[in-house]
Amino acid sequence: YFEIDVFENVIKPGKENILEIEVDSNADSNTAPFVRPLPLGWKQYTGIIREIYLILLPQISIADWKIDYNYNSDFTGCDVVFTFLFQNFNQVSSQSLSGTSELKQENIQEIGYFIEIYNVNTNKLVKDNIASPKYLIIHQAVQDTLRFTFYNIQLWSPETPTLYRFKLSIIGRNKTIIDRYQSAFAFRHIAVRSDGFYLNGQKIKLKGIHRIEQHPNYGISLPYEIQKQDVKLIKDLGINIIRTGPYPNHPYVYDICDQMGIMVLEEIPTFQIPPEIIGRKEVIEHASGLLQEMINRDRRHPSIIGWGIGSELNVSAQKTLHFVQQLSNKARLLDKRLLYYSTNMLDDDNCNNFVDFRLIDLYSPDIAQFKNAIEALIRVNLGSPIVIGRIGSSVVPENASGGYLDKTSLEHQAYYLGNILNIFNSNDRISGLFLWSFADWQGAVPSIAEGRSLTQSTYHWGILTENREPRRAYQYLKSTFINNTMLALTPGTIPDESQGKLIYIGFLIFIFLLILIKQHRWFGQNFRRSLIYPKIFFEDIIDNRNIQIWQTVVIGIIISASFGLGFASFYFFYKRNVFFDYIISSFILSKTVKTIIIYLIWHPIANVIVITVSLMLIIGLLAFLQRYFLLLFNVQCTNTFVFNIIVWSGTSGIFVLPFSMAIYGSLQHTSLLIIYGVVLAFFLIWFILRFLIALRMLFRYNFLKVLVSFIVVCFLLSGGLALFFQSAYKSFTYAKLYISVVCSQTR
């Protein structure tokens, strides 16, 4: 949002005048953190996406205004101070367009002004100073205040959204009207205490919903009728507050919220920015600019009760604390409204002293996890209200027949949100809750959780579709909480996601290995000897005896498949976990590659095959690089030779197979997951020890050289990849953010 002054003396009367506005949509180091594509984020629209207005103003007009309120104890009366800033554009020459300003002393003028205040509902004149206008001497600009005392005021609230309107008239000395301006305002007071929120002195629960301003046909440039329809649909649901998100919406939305009585939390797009980035001076300056633009544009709306300075921040970090402190100080200078941020962290919050309250974004915990989270928040939020900033349930739009036991069904979304709201309504310690989300929206990154949907970059978390068609959840919530009639929900059956096919594959791998051992004598002997008599076996590799390349390839495939089975099960189990998606997306920013990965995660058998092939290729690449790196130490060997060493050193990895077959079930129990991790670590150490034995035997006199070379090759490969991802995408910085959040929620 911006304004540009075009002065009269640069316009050529009677001729064509062209005003060009050029917008630079390229991201630089300052803006990149604010537009980074993230799963479950929003689609970035660039260019001119809002209306452009050419406003004709007289040379003397109102440039800015604000209202300060001082209510009495029972909110029946209020002392009001209007502050107006008048601008004399005739004082500034055309050179100001190029950055300089010249005052024209002959244009110093005397003006007067008066205001009329009406109750919008009754259109009744409440206050005015028509009989005694105030007169001022204006040079380039002048600021003035006007005081009124109101009695028996009608307060603005969701139940009675009473608006007032003031009409300001600027007059000359001869009472000629120079300019007129009018705007709505309201008497509304919001406060936060340790036990919750108070609107006009009365305690209120924030029953909210998260609205992302987007439509499949219009992008972010929604027509006014759709904006109004959205607010009405929200009002009809019994919602009393909207969380925008996370970026300022069109001002017309707030006009409608003013009229319909829906409170608003509005925030800037500082979404999931890690401490290492958010603490930079240039990022703080850019965020401060966004905050100032938002507040200056929207601070006159009574519906807006709070400004958000950040979303899903790591509030345990000192650099985040510095960011929050700087933006909090900035906001306090601009406006007196409440300040907040959101975080996924349940504890260890170092920043909450600089805001009035915080939102906790939980995404989609099951009911038991939600209750546990509330208990944890009660323990650590003894002096501040608990507000859940984001909680919802995603659906597969095509799954209209499944019952509520199917977690991707439309019925389950209704059942889940109904239970969440019941807990919210029955627990006085929860002061606010925002359902996620009003309608489906499009993102820039395919989501793993949308793997069964036809459109993976459309996030189906809405209780309405993208086209504003109410889902079962909307109908259920409206019926339950507005009409007090309970709609019946069908339980259905729990879909089988046990992945028994992967267990069958594990048995097939095991049977295949047994057949090879039984039918091929040399293969069986090599397999047994590599495990029982590794020193003798590696002596045979030195002498090129008994080892055929096909045996090495087969044993390598079996070992790789044993690990691939475990990885595929792990990925499939966490396919709907938001933070798993975030961590994956920290390293995979290509939309095409992410789409392929999503397909593999949702098709574990194909995933096992791809992981197996990938591991074999990695082993082959290591062997190739190792062979040529050894030449630096005058050590001669073949690619096959090094390949044999690496593969047969890992024969013990076959024993991972039964654990990989059981991992899907063990992931549901933390203790079993720890055991599986210990088993993996054991076999990894076993592999390293066997590999060192092989190197020691094969390169007796060059052992240290070979060992160092192998470590260097591995370091260069892994370090090079890590350096690339970190320098290009800040992958590890973002992954660290998400891991810290997961740790906070699991403590």
Predicted stretch roles:
Residues 1-62, 89, 263:
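Accessory beta-strand-rich segments of carbohydrate-active enzymes
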Residues 14, 87-91, 106-191:
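Extended acidic/polar, glycine-enriched regions
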Residues 28-30, 51, 55-68, 153, ...:
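Active-site-adjacent substrate/metal-binding segments within catalytic domains
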Residues 322-426, 459-463:
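Extracellular glycoside hydrolase catalytic/binding regions
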Residues 409-450:
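Substrate-binding cleft of secreted/luminal carbohydrate-active enzymes
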Residues 437-495, 500-505:
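Aromatic-rich peripheral "rim/lid" segments of glycoside hydrolase catalytic domains that contact
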Residues 517-520, 524-634:
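Selected alpha-helical membrane-embedding segments in polytopic membrane proteins
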Residues 599-613, 619-730:
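Hydrophobic alpha-helical transmembrane segments and adjacent short intramembrane/lumenal linkers
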